[in-house]
Amino acid sequence: MLSLRSVLKHCLSAKKTCSRNISALYITGDKANENYVTLQPYMDFNKTFGERQFLEQSISSRGLDIRLETVLSKYEKYKTHHAQLSKVAEERERVTKRLKELTKSGSSAVQLEELKEHGKSLRNELKALKQTLYPIEDDFIHDYLHLPNLLHVQCPVGGEEKLLYRHGIPKSENKTTSHLARQELVHFVDNNRYYLMEQAALFDVNAMQSLARYFVNHGHFIQTANPDFVRCVLLEANATPLSDYHLVQEEHLQNKINTAYLTGGASFESYLGAMTKLCVYPSVLPLRYVCCGRSYNRAEADLYGPIPSLYTATQTNAVQIFVATQTDNEADSQLEHILNLATDFYKALDIPFRISYATAADLTPAESIRAVIEVYAPSLQRYVCVGRISNYGDFVSKRILFSTRREKHYDFLHMVGGPVLYTSRLIAALVEHGVRLEDCKLLGSISQKPVHQQDLQQFKDLFT
């Protein structure tokens, strides 16, 4: 196994984007000999294109450069060739069946030879049709997989976010000194390298563990541990831009298109590997998981610049939430449940923060709606994201085949998740607000007596 130091060295030298000619999520038959087919996503063309009005609204509201008419024309071409292929395959199957019947009944050699020649002709025709269909299929399916999820009815489609909750009002004062001035707490080198010290280092760990414990004790979540690396097929299934994470340069790569990325264990994509091709009983739903770990997402680094700081750092400790439900209404309820727990945690810190729905233009193609948790950063004089929760509907579960069985058919699960805490940004905001980190009230924390008091109490217990 590669050490983290060598992995980061390779990651930092990798290109920001990865040019790909083949999708890891869908591989056509002509390329399956060279590349292992990891996953075959479920694609319901009739349902997708049957909701054309909502799909067009989703594309336009997100500002995506997708021409639905072009995709539909490719679909018609694909259907025509696929129908022709199916017709020849059925004819060949009938000839094969007929040949077996005549062989058993002892028919004439001439008749048997005619059927054999006809079967060979159909086999060659079928092979030629497959070779013709592969590029058509490849062109259409990859465009189809780029189509976005439908928007939630509550998702803002205009240019403004929808405010859900606000706590405290930022003080209208001059620009506050940056948290980087507190060099006894933060030694910042660049976006990829920084060191938290003393109370900042303690708060970094305690805040993460406390929030996870709060979700376990008060939200009935199960705490898990996830891998730091995710294969490309899962990023594509979640419609995550490959530039969001560092590409890992592997020395011995068996599947050249299904490369690995350094995401961190506290990433939504890190959960997907355990859920791929998984079928659960309805009785265990909803699934509620929480995870503490690292996050190496580069997507938001440019939002809070141009001056590098803890607000722009690409790595941080984080708390990740993952929930799976059977229906969309249950997913909405779980999203509200998560936000209520997160609100309690941030209210206890008593600094200005707000929760709002992000606009459609800010969503990834897989998200139907996103709730953003932001705290006020005095040095930037603006709100910065310290957490977010997204509703994905059944968009991702269809791609990774994550389902539940109900009677004689399968239902794809609705997924909700996201990081509810980025510790580095929260620390930066707290320091700039003049809050003593050791005095912060962390819901879910374990109150411990000083060691000498514990020892004294244990000594007293010996005589009681």
UniProtKB/Swiss-Prot annotation:
<dbReference type="InterPro" id="IPR010978">
    <property type="entry name" value="tRNA-bd_arm"/>
</dbReference>
<dbReference type="GO" id="GO:0004828">
    <property type="term" value="F:serine-tRNA ligase activity"/>
</dbReference>
<dbReference type="GO" id="GO:0000049">
    <property type="term" value="F:tRNA binding"/>
</dbReference>
<dbReference type="Pfam" id="PF00587">
    <property type="entry name" value="tRNA-synt_2b"/>
</dbReference>
<dbReference type="GO" id="GO:0000166">
    <property type="term" value="F:nucleotide binding"/>
</dbReference>
<keyword id="KW-0496">Mitochondrion</keyword>
<protein>
    <recommendedName>
        <fullName>Serine--tRNA synthetase-like protein Slimp</fullName>
    </recommendedName>
</protein>
<dbReference type="GO" id="GO:0070158">
    <property type="term" value="P:mitochondrial seryl-tRNA aminoacylation"/>
</dbReference>
<dbReference type="InterPro" id="IPR015866">
    <property type="entry name" value="Ser-tRNA-synth_1_N"/>
</dbReference>
<dbReference type="GO" id="GO:0005829">
    <property type="term" value="C:cytosol"/>
</dbReference>
<dbReference type="InterPro" id="IPR042103">
    <property type="entry name" value="SerRS_1_N_sf"/>
</dbReference>
<dbReference type="InterPro" id="IPR002317">
    <property type="entry name" value="Ser-tRNA-ligase_type_1"/>
</dbReference>
<keyword id="KW-0694">RNA-binding</keyword>
<comment type="function">
    <text>Essential protein which may play a role in mitochondrial morphogenesis and function. Has transfer RNA (tRNA)-binding activity and can bind tRNA(Ser) but does not have serine--tRNA ligase activity and does not bind ATP.</text>
</comment>
<dbReference type="GO" id="GO:0140715">
    <property type="term" value="C:serine-tRNA ligase complex"/>
</dbReference>
<dbReference type="Pfam" id="PF02403">
    <property type="entry name" value="Seryl_tRNA_N"/>
</dbReference>
<dbReference type="GO" id="GO:0032543">
    <property type="term" value="P:mitochondrial translation"/>
</dbReference>
<comment type="similarity">
    <text>Belongs to the class-II aminoacyl-tRNA synthetase family. Type-1 seryl-tRNA synthetase subfamily.</text>
</comment>
<dbReference type="GO" id="GO:0005739">
    <property type="term" value="C:mitochondrion"/>
</dbReference>
<keyword id="KW-0809">Transit peptide</keyword>
<dbReference type="InterPro" id="IPR002314">
    <property type="entry name" value="aa-tRNA-synt_IIb"/>
</dbReference>
<dbReference type="InterPro" id="IPR045864">
    <property type="entry name" value="aa-tRNA-synth_II/BPL/LPL"/>
</dbReference>
